[in-house]
């Protein structure tokens, strides 16, 4: 998940540098969503993950 977030962030930065406003906004929004989903899944796996015997 974090990899996809970083990929979308890089796409957004490149698009912003080249002046593609709509594409940069879309990629930045997608990066934020993927990042938040990744954090939520990490926290869920942290609390429900490996149990001690």
Swiss-Prot record:
GO cellular component, one term: plasma membrane
Disulphide-bridged cysteine pairs: none
Keyword Hydrolase: no
Name recorded for this polypeptide: UPF0391 membrane protein ECA0470
Keywords: Cell membrane, Membrane, Transmembrane, Transmembrane helix
InterPro entries: DUF1328
Species of provenance: Pectobacterium atrosepticum (strain SCRI 1043 / ATCC BAA-672)
Location of this chain's protein in the cell: Cell membrane
Bilayer-spanning residue ranges: 4-24, 30-47
Entry similarity comment: Belongs to the UPF0391 family.
Membrane topology annotation: Multi-pass membrane protein
Main location: membrane
């Amino acid at each position: 998940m974090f990899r996809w977030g970083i990929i979308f962030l890089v796409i957004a930065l490149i698009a912003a540098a080249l002046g593609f406003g709509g594409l940069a906004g879309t990629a930045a929004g997608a990066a934020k969503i993927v990042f938040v989903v990744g954090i939520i899944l990490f926290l869920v796996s942290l609390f429900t993950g490996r149990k001690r015997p």
